[in-house]
Structure formats: structure tokens, C-alpha cells
């Protein structure tokens, strides 16, 4: 974790601008993810003639690479400093675009084309984990650890914004110039971000002796578990709300997803100081309560307006969960390990979103679509109970943390 430079207290617009000037590099990395997201499955399946399995695998490779590389990103950020990690990650995003370009050149050889696409996706996953983790830590190093919750919140906002912009923009690029046009756009975004990052001043890496990974995991895993349980609510909304509306015979699933996104981003913008004022665990418990009500409304909805209100409340509730628990998780370790702590904590959400889809799909096949929202509400209730326990008995007092220290 970088050592923040001592400076006068920041607040308001100046603080937000300082944070945005750093998290824009995470925006760039997620834009390179969003650009090919709506294009590559169709390209692999329709243009190259591969099965739906291979089309899905090409997309999933990036998520697996992100999941596996994220702990390394945190550790290297602690040792080398976050700016170097961000630049490294953005270079990975650039190379992913190069992989797409080479795949287009090799389109006459389908297997080589597929291998190059897969390689580009793996490199993109690694690049995103480094750019995302590094930009958060760089932002904290610039504005100070007091504002870590706000830095994490802004990172989430730019992530959603980049993904929302990237998908339609990628479709336009593909319609304009094919896979080559898409690849050049990805490379251009990443290269511009690298050129903007290089002149910016870096923050010093902390020189303290780092804890071993097992000790870091012992300090943050309970916070990560609460995050994983709460992420199930987001997972079932994002993945299955369209099927839910179809099963009910309703229109408006796309609008429901828009409501979720507006509630998610709006809550982060409306309550930027909530975590500092109330404390991370208190905010998390309030958020869990709102998310539970929202999921129960969706699961029991008899009319479309009930489902829409439920989706809105779920978005509001889930919005501050990640930064609220993340602030406490990161502060549970020494400064020289806070990069590793943030990365390890984030892995729990990655894993949760990875398994929520298949497991919820099995439950849906067995018991129907509405049941998955009731089940998700139960998981969020477990997160609420776990967080209440953490408030009463922090991990530093728990045997598993003590034995790892």
C-alpha cells in the first residue's frame, strides 16, 4: 500500500476531482473490457463458425485470468508502488487489442484465430486486475487513507460507466471496421491511458515488511465472505431478471436493469461520506437490510411495479456494500499489506459472481425463477448476521486471525 503524501485536508469538489484523475485509468481498463463484450461471442459463433461453448469460453477466459491474477496485483502494488502496476495493467489492455488484431489477420485459419482471441482475453484479464487494483491504491495514496471508501466508490462508478459505454461503442466500431476496427479502438484507448499515466507523479511504496499471504487472508476472509454472500443479490438480478420478466409475461426487463444501475451509481454519489460518518460495518448492515427487502419484493412480485421497486432497492442496498466492508478489510492489515488485502477481498466477489449464475440456474430449473430471489435474500441475511458478528468481535480477536498473524 502506498504511503500518502502529507497535505492539507481535501474535501468536496477538489477531493472528487483528485480521485477521478486517478480512477480514470480504471475507467480506461474497463472500457477495453466493455468494447468487445457484445461483439466477440457473435464473432466466434457466427463469423468463425465455432459452437456456443467456445463463444462463451472466449469471454470467460478474461474473468478467470482476472480472478487468478488479482492477488498478485495487490502484492506487486505493495512492493513496487501502484503507478507501475497501473501502467503494466494498461499495457496488458493494449496487448489484448493487438491479440484481436492478429486474430483478424489470421481469420483464414480458424484455430489460430481462436487461440489469438483467447490469448488476448487472458492478457486483458491480467491487465484489468493490475490496472483496477493499482488505480484504487494510487488514488488512496494521493488523497490519504481517510478517503479510501470514497476512492473505492468512485472506482465502482467508473466501472459501471465504462461497461455501459463500451458495449454499444464496440458494436459501432465492429460495424464500422470489423474486428480490426474494434481492435484498433481497444489499442487506442489503452495507449492514450498509458500516455496520460506516465507523466503523473507516483506515490511511494511502503517499505515495511509484508505479512505472508496466509496472514492477510486470515485478516480479511470474513469480510470477503460477507461480500460474497451479498453479491448473490447482484448476480441474480444481472443474470436472471430478463428470464424472470419472461416467466411472468411482463415487458420492461431492460428498464429494470437500468433502474438497478441508476440506483447503484446514484447511491454512491448521494452518500459519499456515509462510510466515514457511520463506520463501514454499520453502513454494510443498513445496506444488507435494504437489499433483503428489495430481493423479497422481486421474489414475491405480483405486479411489474413491485419488481421494479425491488430491483431499485436491491441496487441501492448493494451499492455501498463493497466500499463499506472494503474499508474495514483494508484497515485490518498493516499499510504495507493493504494492496494484498484489497485484492484478496475483491477475489471473494469475483468468485461469488462466478458461481452464482450456475447455482441459481440449477435452483431455477428445480423450483422456478422467483425462488432464486428469495434464496438470494436468505444469503444476504446471512451476510447481515456475519457482519453483526464482526462488529461485536472483530477478526483481530478471532482465533483464525490470531493464528495467521
Curated annotation (Swiss-Prot):
InterPro entries: MFS (IPR011701), MFS_dom (IPR020846), MFS_trans_sf (IPR036259), MFS_Transporters (IPR050171), MFS_YhhS-like (IPR023008). It is found in: Cell inner membrane. It is a multi-pass membrane protein. Keywords: Cell inner membrane, Cell membrane, Membrane, Transmembrane, Transmembrane helix, Transport. Pfam families: MFS_1 (PF07690). GO terms for molecular function: transmembrane transporter activity. Gene3D superfamilies: MFS general substrate transporter like domains. Its main location: membrane. One of its GO terms (cellular component) is plasma membrane. The chain crosses the membrane at residues 19-39, 48-68, 85-105, 129-149, 156-176, 178-198, 224-244, 252-272, 283-303, 309-329, 344-364, 366-386. Belongs to the major facilitator superfamily. YhhS family. This is Uncharacterized MFS-type transporter YhhS. The lineage of its organism: Bacteria, Pseudomonadati, Pseudomonadota, Gammaproteobacteria, Enterobacterales.
